[in-house]
């Protein structure tokens, strides 16, 4: 809808079953506690299957052995994924040692998976270990509350070790926003931490009794880095600094990448600029955006429920005016800001605080001991001696932050001996995939297991055309939900079926343009043949400093997506 003909503020009609479930759940309790004690199944039943998501977990099974187990008349091998709440990705070394121990002793896969939402996941937690994992997290000051389902998810914050003062201020705001928007129900504490039921009635002053219509994602961004990919998120606070000190934020609302194959009513969308606000209004504005989406978001169709669709339906100006009314402010004009990149600076960086920060490239964020590369053990050894903290980046990498000069050599020695500092190409550093098979129930094609060898092939093409020192932002996501953020890449592969992907081109290096589908449902050899030709052309015909995505648009290879709500599918 355009501004002149906005749609209805509230979509009338039959509510989705998810709305019934939330309403009947008694503020997210359901019968999870009873289900925990049912030893006849390894999973959670009925509504609890979905309710555990509000508690930071997804029920999954090992898809590699699903058919085999069905033949044996066995239920799937159910296990939970747990995602920690970790605003801004900062974790202490004491916390790291605790999660390392749990992953090694109590999960099927034994790994820690860093995610592009700056947190970690455990995969393969059997039902008997579900309560212990929450208690372990609580014992070191962590939790998994609201990291999935219809809540404000883990709040991202730019990992900028150089601008230490600015990062510290922005990180504090990421934590404050996260805390402010958390659910108030005591269900989490009662079920997992055995805290007593209190006689008071639950209330959710911000989220409401049926919570949000759909997932909601928030970031705090420090330009010129767009490492957190703001346009993938519902609500973004872009830090504006004066003399190195944070003074306020530009607010951008309504980004999001998830689509459904062939459903033209779904689209990826970049976020819209609302305006500038001084720091003191941050929490009021965050609450106003969330409550406006709570009240106006579409609860009759989950595929049309995210903030991006609400904005398109009611109009950006209408939504913005309502946020101003609820927050009791008027936005000032957007302050100037620009992005220059979104990759991590791998290796040592000295901050203005004179501390050193070591960014380690972790392919696909998967931390495990591999033959000859004991990544997990190496990080544990560093955690035992490091006095600073660890920071997970939105590129699935890890920063050993705040290293004094005197400790630098010791930490580097462990990192090198563990394979944590092995040299990789710029292309590999700028490539990313979601988890996909074997654990994700939504996966249509491989992603994490496909990426390493795929990038070997891309590296060969880059070398063939003399551009090995360059990179193309390349991402693979196993399904159109888009966790791998392929819909903000220069080259994005979106899983369609086993071994087949939709190839998207025409995004840019800084993540401000949605790529358009170039070819549908093609295999890896077909993708490589197309990219061989296009990388060759880019190498020969590009202008100085021109990225691959910008080149494909300028050369007329692909039409840029200018208004995704209307022209993404054309």
Swiss-Prot record:
Enzyme nomenclature, EC number: 1.8.1.2
Pathway connected to this protein: Sulfur metabolism; hydrogen sulfide biosynthesis; hydrogen sulfide from sulfite (NADPH route): step 1/1
Keywords: 4Fe-4S, Amino-acid biosynthesis, Cysteine biosynthesis, Heme, Iron, Iron-sulfur, Metal-binding, NADP, Oxidoreductase
Gene Ontology molecular functions: 4 iron, 4 sulfur cluster binding; heme binding; metal ion binding; NADP binding; sulfite reductase (ferredoxin) activity; sulfite reductase (NADPH) activity
Cellular component annotations (GO), alphabetically ordered: sulfite reductase complex (NADPH)
Substrates-to-products reaction catalysed: hydrogen sulfide + 3 NADP(+) + 3 H2O = sulfite + 3 NADPH + 4 H(+)
One Pfam short name: NIR_SIR_ferr
Binding site residues for siroheme: 483
Lineage top rank: taxon: Bacteria
Biological processes, Gene Ontology terms: cysteine biosynthetic process; hydrogen sulfide biosynthetic process; sulfate assimilation
Free-text remark on how the cofactor is bound: Binds 1 siroheme per subunit.
Swiss-Prot/TrEMBL cofactor(s): siroheme; [4Fe-4S] cluster
Binding of [4Fe-4S] cluster, residues: 434, 440, 479, 483
Recorded family membership: Belongs to the nitrite and sulfite reductase 4Fe-4S domain family.
Subunit structure: Alpha(8)-beta(8). The alpha component is a flavoprotein, the beta component is a hemoprotein.
Protein role: Component of the sulfite reductase complex that catalyzes the 6-electron reduction of sulfite to sulfide. This is one of several activities required for the biosynthesis of L-cysteine from sulfate.
Protein name per the record: Sulfite reductase [NADPH] hemoprotein beta-component
Source organism per UniProt: Escherichia coli O7:K1 (strain IAI39 / ExPEC)
């Amino acid at each position: 809808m355009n501004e002149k003909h906005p749609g209805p503020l509230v979509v009338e009609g039959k509510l989705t079953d998810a709305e019934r479930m939330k309403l009947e759940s008694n503020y997210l309790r359901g019968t999870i506690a009873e289900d925990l004690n049912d030893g006849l199944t390894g999973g959670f039943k009925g509504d609890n299957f979905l309710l555990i998501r509000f508690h930071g977990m997804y029920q999954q099974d090992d898809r590699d052995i699903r058919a085999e187990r069905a033949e044996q008349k066995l239920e799937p091998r159910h296990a939970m994924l747990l995602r920690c709440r970790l605003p801004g990705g900062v974790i202490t070394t004491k916390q790291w040692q605790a999660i390392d121990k749990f992953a090694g002793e109590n999960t099927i896969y034994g790994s820690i998976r860093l995610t592009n939402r700056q947190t970690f996941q455990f995969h393969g937690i059997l039902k008997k270990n579900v309560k212990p994992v929450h208690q372990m997290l609580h014992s070191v000051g962590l939790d998994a509350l609201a990291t999935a389902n219809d809540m404000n998810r883990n709040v991202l914050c730019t990992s900028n070790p150089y601008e230490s003062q600015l990062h510290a201020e922005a990180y504090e705001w990421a934590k404050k926003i996260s805390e402010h928007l958390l659910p108030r129900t005591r269900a989490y504490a009662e079920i997992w931490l055995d805290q007593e039921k209190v006689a008071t009635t639950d209330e959710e002053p911000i989220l409401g009794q049926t919570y949000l219509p759909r997932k909601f994602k928030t970031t705090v961004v420090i330009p010129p880095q767009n490492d957190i990919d703001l346009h993938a998120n519902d609500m973004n606070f872009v830090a504006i600094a004066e003399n190195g000190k944070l003074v306020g934020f530009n607010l951008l609302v309504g980004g999001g990448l998830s689509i459904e194959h062939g459903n033209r009513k779904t689209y990826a969308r970049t976020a819209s600029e609302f305006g500038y606000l001084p720091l003191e209004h941050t929490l009021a504005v965050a609450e106003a955006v969330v409550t406006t989406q709570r009240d106006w978001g579409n609860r009759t169709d989950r595929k049309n429920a995210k903030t991006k669709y609400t904005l398109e339906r009611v109009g950006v100006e209408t939504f913005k005016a309502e946020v101003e009314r609820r927050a009791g402010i008027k936005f000032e004009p957007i302050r100037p800001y620009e992005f220059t990149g979104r990759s991590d600076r791998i290796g040592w960086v000295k901050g203005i605080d004179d501390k050193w920060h070591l960014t380690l490239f972790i392919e696909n964020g998967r931390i495990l001991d591999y033959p000859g590369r004991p990544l997990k053990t190496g990080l544990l050894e560093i955690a035992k001696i490091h006095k600073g903290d660890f920071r997970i980046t939105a590129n699935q990498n890890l920063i050993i932050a705040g290293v004094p000069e005197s400790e630098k050599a010791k930490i580097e020695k462990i990192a090198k001996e563990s394979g944590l500092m092995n040299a990789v190409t710029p292309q590999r550093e700028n490539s990313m995939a979601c988890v996909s098979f074997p654990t994700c129930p939504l996966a249509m094609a491989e992603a994490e297991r496909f990426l390493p060898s795929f990038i070997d092939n891309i590296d060969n093409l880059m070398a063939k055309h003399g551009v090995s020192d360059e990179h193309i932002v390349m991402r693979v996501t196993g399904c159109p939900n888009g966790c791998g953020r392929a819909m903000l890449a220069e080259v994005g592969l979106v899983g369609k079926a086993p071994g087949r992907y939709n190839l998207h081109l025409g995004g840019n290096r800084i993540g401000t343009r949605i790529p358009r589908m170039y070819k549908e449902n093609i295999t890896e050899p077909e993708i490589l043949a197309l990219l061989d030709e296009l990388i060759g052309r880019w190498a020969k015909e590009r202008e100085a400093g021109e990225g691959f995505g910008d080149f494909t648009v300028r050369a007329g290879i692909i039409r840029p997506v200018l208004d995704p709500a209307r022209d993404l599918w054309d």
